[in-house]
């Protein structure tokens, strides 16, 4: 079987102008970046939101991932094969994980968005623009202090960090400004990965360029010596940051291998941010297509919860149908089966691990939607394992439909497409909690209803953070919980369906520009590291073509 990149490179891409015509993008709104990718000028697209929105999420993954994006893309092609004017709205890959554990991140097999090499490596420069804006702000903060510090910024309480789109553990803790007075004030700080920057979250939640600049101005970068918050607006930096992001705010148009238009824009992580593609891209797609398929990172406990409670709240979105992607191997992994034994038939482990899928189904129902389970088939799956899961689905009164989009593209998801077409007709989603009840109430609701926890425990530092939020009137914002993707608890070793645990919150961080409060739990880090054998070792160039992107 050819690799993902070999499949993508063997495919003849349609001109992006043809894809734009298929999507209904006016010619004067198309900004080509070569022949196979483009940006869309959002000022020239009518904001009608007439399409139906379908959310694709997943179960708790194995470290290799379960093919959620692959199923999303294949399903979009299947919907088009069934006569729907479908459009995909998907996140841009982060370069760090591409070079780290994941390799390519634009789908897989015959269910990909293309040109996959461009999308994975630099694309249209959105991540670079976000990185530049983030680091320009960091430079302006340090320069303000160096030039006299009229705002009285306390260097010990600067919370803004520089960012890069890499996995580099050595940058987690650094000291800047060394070398004497001429080189600035020594400051203990660190780097985040670009996908975890608040500017990434802002870009993905802004309604337009005007809203983007207003959100940038509200970013809190630290505190003064008198414990007052310091904002970007006080530094008068929002205009420069907006200028750097002027083009990045427009969504990117590419295509699937099946010729379905795809808006690929923004890429916040779901375990350390809100995990959804840009609201601008989603709303643009809803104005163009009759069915828009989008995804939220990791499982229902992370990306999907944040989609319903953060993104949908900001954008006034209604989710008409939801698909939960599951795999046999992940269910066995959630029963404690070692990674090197996941391809061996194990009905006992499958029966034990299916409780994880059960919780994810219940989670989606908590938002008012009856989910459909898409079983992403692998060659190692046996008939006995699949039949056992079908029997389980009957006891849960949930549809479970096997799909083979990796091998067959849209043809491998036609049954799923038919089920989604029925499901999306009469469903209305809702939020899980009311932010007006306060941060602690929001945290407890999510912990109990989505994670199966009994209680939430705030550390001493988190209590101090809460008091600071309350003093500044920020304690009625939605919460964005930063948590491991491998467990419903904050302990990645607690697989399956842990119940009655305590969610430990160590920090509450104001992300006022984005419009939410980040609750840090467990040991989640905002700058990943590379694995022992990074995917970068397999990537290269032969005769001008990229090789090794899985």
UniProtKB/Swiss-Prot annotation:
Top EC class for this record: ligase
Biological pathway: One-carbon metabolism; tetrahydrofolate interconversion
Gene that this sequence comes from: fhs
Annotated binding of ATP, by residue: 62-69
Name of the protein: Formate--tetrahydrofolate ligase
Keywords in alphabetical order: ATP-binding, Ligase, Nucleotide-binding, One-carbon metabolism
The family this protein is said to belong to: Belongs to the formate--tetrahydrofolate ligase family.
Protein's GO biological process: tetrahydrofolate interconversion
HAMAP family assigned to the protein according to its UniProt record, in alphabetical order: FTHFS (MF_01543)
GO molecular function, one term: ATP binding
Catalysed reaction equations from the record: (6S)-5,6,7,8-tetrahydrofolate + formate + ATP = (6R)-10-formyltetrahydrofolate + ADP + phosphate
